[in-house]
Each structure stands twice: as structure tokens, then as C-alpha cells.
Amino acid sequence: MARNISFTVKYWKQDGPTAQGHFDTHEMKNIPDDTSFLEMLDILNEELIESGQEPFVFDHDCREGICGMCSLYINGTPHGKTERGATTCQLYMRRFNDGDVITVEPWRSAGFPIIKDCMVDRSAFDKIIQAGGYTSIRTGQAQDANAILIPKENADEAMDCATCIGCGACVAACKNGSAMLFVRSE
């Protein structure tokens, strides 16, 4: 059975890549904990518009964990406290407690300049993905894959890398902030 929670959303507001940004806060009341994080942001925007304020800008597309457009920093973590490998749209309010302060920020990387609020320009990153050449060195002659025994633990860990959807969390979270280190597995 869903419970309702109330909390404070502290969200990033910025008019563009060179504008000075700041945090705004809004009290959210009686939000069902089976609400997705993006649905909660939709409710936030409805409340902001009803009170005559400008809505909070964030990006999203599929809302199914496929595209990665919903990528946000939530409480200092890419995508927030989701299940392993999940995206922001797969985060539900049951991960939060009544009375929490939830901080929402854009990706913090020069490779993702801010368009407005938490919407970032992903075009440089998209070009790397579209180029398809994530590895730029020759690997030589590889043995037949069936001839190399791989322990199950290593195979399971490798599968985590194969689930990449190109959201950019690795680049945003990396202190190097370099999209050139991106090694998407496909």
C-alpha cells in the first residue's frame, strides 16, 4: 500500500550556460511514494505554474529507462539512489523519507553545458556515440571467445557494462569530466 510523503525539493535554476545559477526550494505535500521521480517533477511544475512561477526545466523522453535523457544529479548522485543500473525515470519516491530535502542538479561537466535549469546540451557526447568508434587502438588477433574460460563473477560484472544506454552518468560523475574516456559497450 502506498504511503504519502511530504518533503522539500531544492532544485537548480539557471537561464543558460553563462548565467549565474541558484537553488530554489519548494515544499511538496502528500506525494504518493509510488510516484516516479519525473512524475513528482511534473507535479512540482504544476504547482509552480498555479502559483504564477516559472516551471523548472528538465529533460526527459521515454520515461522507460531506455534513452537516458532524464539524467539528473539527485542528492549528489547521478540518477539518485536507484536500483543498480537504473536511470532517473526509474527512481520512485519510496526511496525517500517523509521530511527529506531532495536536491536536484544538472550534470556538472564542461561537456554538458546548461541550456536552462537542469536541461543540458548533450550534442558533443551524442557525436561520440554516433561516431561508433569508442576504441581507437587496434587490439590485434583475439582468441576465439569460446576458448577463453571466464569465471561467472567476471562475466556477471561485464554484463553491467553492457547495459550502457549512453546517458552520460559516467562522464558527469568522473572527476576528469572527459567524454573522451567514454567506452560505451554495444
Where are these regions (language model features)?
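Signature of N-terminal electron-transfer/Fe-S-associated modules in redox systems
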Residues: 1-186
